[in-house]
Amino acid sequence: MPARTSPRALPVRTPDTPRPKIAYVLPVYDEADNVAPFHAALTEATAVRDDLDWEFLYVNDGSRDESLARLLELRRHDPRVGVLDLARNCGHQIAVTAGLDAAGDADAVIVMDTDLQDPPRVSLEMVGLWEDGADVVYAQRRSRRDTLFKRTTAWAFYRVLDRLASVDIPRDVGDFRLMDRRVVAEVARYREQDRFLRGIVAHVGFRQEALLFDRDERHAGTSGYPLGRMLAFAANGILGFSTAPLRMITRLGFALSALSVVMAAYVASVRLLRPEDSVPGWAFLGVGMFLLAGLQLVMMGVIGSYVGRTYTQVQGRPLYSLALTARGEHSGVRSLPQTPPDLRTQHGSVS
């Protein structure tokens, strides 16, 4: 953990001085049963800091249930609630990005999920560390109450990523973190289509501190990250911050070449010195051919993954489109259900 920095220089408070603003970016996907209890826990936790202005910015990631209706109901009762509704399901990382883009005017931004696995009270400790001078405070899991499969795969992923990544990405850390506005502004410059935000934040730098916490169980519902999405997310982390798979292909090629030289020398020596013991070896030859063909296809797949990421990136498509925005005490709900697709994309997209 980095050494504690000097306290953050906050403006001298006068009756006309605005209070520091802390914005929560809260991605939501099929969390209709969790929205109300989460918001109640969050407002209770933040009520102890009435010296700060709070904004609760929920980002609906194309939920299929009643999540959007529940969020708009929260907004009717709490003007601090903002709602962004993505035009389609773009994934957790893009939803967080949309929230960060919208919350860039805050002094600090806290990203957390809405399933109550990340306790809202921990975010208040993050604010304290931010006031002490940290630019990024990431919540590091001391323990987690997940299934054995989830714990095992997460443990393996973070260790593999730690060995392969070109930047120092903390282990056992998700997206639950606080970022100073300077960090948020820098993260906004990273527009990768295949996003791995915890790697991006690590790459940005600044003063980063860990905050240990115990992760709870989900309050209700099931995880929005099935096995397929977990594997894709892991691939984004490895391919986005490491060229080690490409280097492994080169090393494997040299190793197989060396092995083929040894095998050729062995076959030649047997043929010359003990011809009566030589065997045609068609079975061995067939197995070897299939093995090499399989390895070549795997290598092409790895190269293709990098090429595919490059192709997706150079297309320059917007990361997301907004179908609805509701923010601030005086902002109304802006929905675009009848707008033609081309105009809708221009009006609601951030590239």
Regions found by a protein language model. Give the residues of each.
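Hydrophobic helical membrane-anchoring modules
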Residues: 2-18, 198-351
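A generic fold-level signal
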Residues: 17-19, 51, 103-104, 171, ...
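Residues in soluble alpha-helical coiled-coils and helical-bundle/repeat scaffolds
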Residues: 29-33, 117, 121, 188, ...
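Short, hydrophobic secondary-structure boundary micro-motifs
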Residues: 54, 137-139, 169-172, 247-250, ...
